[in-house]
Every structure is written in C-alpha cells, then in structure tokens.
C-alpha cells in the first residue's frame, strides 16, 4: 500500500466522521427550528363537584329556588336591571349562613380551588386563596349574561345545579383578542387551544374554574326550563 493510498484512506475516514457530525448537528438544528412551545397558557378546570366529597344537588336546587322566592330585594334588582330570571348577586352575601347545604358546597369548592391553584404554580407567599363571595343564578327561557370579567379576584367559577336541554352554554374569549388587529380569523375546525372562543356545555353537578381575568359570557337559554347555577369568587387573603 503506497503512502498516497494510506493518506487517501485516512482522509476518507475523517470526511466520513465530519459528515456524520454535520448530519447530527443539522438534525438538532432543524429539530429546534421546528419545535413549537405553548406559551401563556389559559387553564380551564372542569370537574364533578362530587369528586372531592358528597353533595346533594337536589337539596341545593330546592334551596336556590326557595331563596329566589323570598328575596324581594334580589327580585327588584333583577327587574330594575333587566335580568331575565333571578340572581342574588346584588342582594345576599350570606348564603353559607342561610342553609347548611351552602356550607357543604363551600367546603367542596375549597378543595376544587386548592387543586386548581396547585396546578397554576402561584407563589402565594404563605397566604391563602379564600372564598370571597358566592351567588345564585336562575336564568329563565331567553335569558343570558353578557361578556364580563371578575375584577379584584383570583379564581372565579360556577357550580351547575340544574341544566335543562338547550340551556345556554358558557363561552370563554381569548384574552389577547384586542391585540389581534391584523390577524386572520381561525379556521372553524381549529384546534381547541387555538380557537378565539371556547364554548362549554355544562351539566348538573359539574364545576368550572378559571382565573378571574378571563372574559366569558353565558349564551341565551333556549330551554323552557330554568338554568340554575351558583357562581363564586376566590381572593388572595391578606
């Protein structure tokens, strides 16, 4: 074997190693370039109330309807503000004192909120997320609740008590919507995490939780039955 042959074989071996290295690095580079990471994720917690403790939904519904019949101030507020149905939002702040079932509901909600908060990785500085208020909503046929947020709270949500067929769904809005001035609309079959709006059809016995800054609305109740739910806010304790 001549000296030139030896050098050629050595050069060929080095070239093979170089090509292998380039191929590996190029794969790593193209892999990184193709990676898409979900950032600034909006979390929606959906669970059954009974998954953390027993609760008599039938008793809760009877209590809601009984309070609605007796709360004259709440009825007047609904009439003055064009609310189609009944809400205790502006009239009662002591539901847990009126019927024991609301105290049971609070204990169950506390557990669900604790589960949700743990997943959100909040730095609470040794303070707690505690119930701030809860209120009854009873929407009549044709009733709805316009788009809104819950300012000054951390976690908001709704427990669903009685949801007839064709009752209004709850719809959430992408919180970045006001910044999408030049963005084209999403496809109708876009993935859930990419949609501008997300609608959820609740069922009785279900609880939904979200961060209070998330804009949402209740769509029109298309059923002749009443849509009964209990909404609530949790705050960061002092």
Protein language model regions, located:
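Solvent-exposed residues in well-ordered beta-strands and their adjoining turns
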Residues: 50, 139, 160-162, 233-237
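Hydrophobic residues positioned within well-ordered beta-strands of beta-sheet architectures
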Residues: 45, 132-134, 155-157, 228-232
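Active-site region of the double-stranded beta-helix
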Residues: 94, 100-130, 140-154, 161-165
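Short N-terminal helix-initiation segments at or just after the protein's N-terminus
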Residues: 75-82, 94-106, 152, 171-180, ...
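Non-heme Fe(II)/2-oxoglutarate
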Residues: 26-123
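Catalytic core of non-heme Fe(II) oxygenases with the double-stranded beta-helix
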Residues: 136-209
């Amino acid at each position: 074997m001549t000296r030139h042959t030896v050098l050629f074989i050595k050069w060929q071996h080095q070239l093979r190693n170089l090509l292998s290295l380039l191929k590996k690095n190029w794969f790593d580079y193209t892999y990184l370039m193709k990676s898409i990471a979900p950032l600034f994720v909006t979390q929606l917690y959906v669970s059954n109330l009974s998954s953390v403790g027993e609760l008599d939904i039938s008793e809760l519904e009877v209590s809601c309807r009984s309070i609605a019949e007796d709360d004259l101030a709440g009825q007047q507020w609904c009439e003055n503000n064009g609310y189609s149905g009944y809400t205790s939002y502006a009239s009662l702040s002591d539901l847990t004192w009126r019927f024991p079932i609301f105290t049971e509901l609070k204990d169950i909600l506390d557990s669900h909120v604790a589960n949700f908060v743990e997943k959100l990785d909040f730095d609470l500085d040794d303070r707690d997320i505690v119930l701030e208020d809860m209120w009854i909503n009873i929407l009549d046929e044709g009733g709805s609740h316009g788009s809104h947020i819950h300012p000054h709270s951390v976690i908001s949500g709704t427990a669903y008590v009685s949801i007839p067929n064709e009752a209004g769904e709850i719809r959430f809005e992408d919180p970045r919507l006001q910044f999408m001035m030049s963005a084209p609309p999403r496809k109708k079959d876009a993935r859930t995490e990419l949609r501008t709006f997300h609608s959820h059809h609740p069922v009785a016995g279900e609880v939904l939780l979200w961060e209070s800054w998330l804009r949402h609305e209740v769509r029109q109740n298309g059923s002749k039955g009443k849509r009964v739910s209990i909404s609530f806010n949790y705050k960061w304790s002092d």
